[in-house]
Amino acid sequence: MANKLIVAPAPHVQTSQSTARIMRDVVIALMPALVVSTVVFGADVLRVTALSVAACVAFEYLIQKFLVRGAVTVTNWSAAVTGVLLAFNLPASIPWWIVVIGAFVAIAIAKMTFGGLGKNPFNPALVGRVFLLIAYPVQMTTFPMPVNGAFDALSGATPLAAVKHGAAADVLGVQELLLGNMPGSMGEVAALALLCGFVYLLWRRVITWQIPVTVLATMALFAFVVALCSGESGAALWQLPLFHVLAGGAILGAVFMATDYSTSPMTVRGRVIFAVGIGAITMCIRLWGAYPEGMSFAILIMNACVPLINKYVKPKRFGVK
């Protein structure tokens, strides 16, 4: 009875959705992209995804069982979601031991060190991805060509990397960007499948539209202004915005990672500020940074700003005009 009188710090969110149900919906929303990625890159996609999920679940179980010695919560599917998202940020050709290291960093360091689900300030899958990118840059930037392409098993540059090194923004058509028949990480090659997952999450009311739409709109507007200042006109003026929205990890990050409950602001206005920051930082890194992709860094930077956003962007108290 005494435990029922303990009140946790605000905010107090009331919802009929359980954590397990929310996480299962996220996994279901990721399935279309997993299928497309498997078609594009072959069975290695299933190998990497299964290993990543198994490693994340195993590390969380072992830490909760033998180190924390508390309740084991692997049945809430949160570790499985982290495993799938981590896998989606990796090349299909990545060695198995790098996947295990990434899972350890994501779960043990980025999640359980801070107390577990809901207490982590940074998205665990992205922390694992960025760590691997810094520690193993060659393996993380060596991408297999699509299995139905002309250069099976050879490494190729992603569309973002090609544009970074001087290629035109129309290096790939809209169809290729939507269907994913191109080199890249497992989860960034199927824009249409990811958009289907976005619609599903909206329908299930797992996420709201503010963060994904604002992130992508900010990126498109940023790219449009850059193209305009570069003297582009006509169809070329719209190619750069469309390319940056559909290429790389823009949709994956905006829909599935930036919307993480524990690492995003509580208010609608705060989410918009958060999303604008992600979109702007992503474009700055893509256009002028050292890496062709900046979504992971942008989300983690804005994750660090969430406490500040929540502090200064608060809803009005009841009765206050």
Predicted regions and their residues:
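Cytosolic-side transmembrane-helix boundaries in multi-pass membrane proteins
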Residues: 1-24, 285-321
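N-terminal signal-anchor module of multipass membrane proteins
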Residues: 1-57
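Structural signature of hydrophobic alpha-helical transmembrane segments
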Residues: 42-55, 93-102, 177, 181-191, ...
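C-terminal ends of transmembrane helices
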Residues: 58-70, 107-119, 196-205, 255-264, ...
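Cytoplasmic-side transmembrane-helix entry/capping segments in multi-pass membrane proteins
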Residues: 71-82, 98-104, 119-130, 209-217, ...
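A generic, well-ordered mixed alpha/beta core segment in the N-terminal half of proteins
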Residues: 78-150
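Long hydrophobic alpha-helical segments that form multi-pass transmembrane helix bundles
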Residues: 119-195
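Loop-to-transmembrane alpha-helix initiation sites
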Residues: 121, 125, 242-248, 271, ...
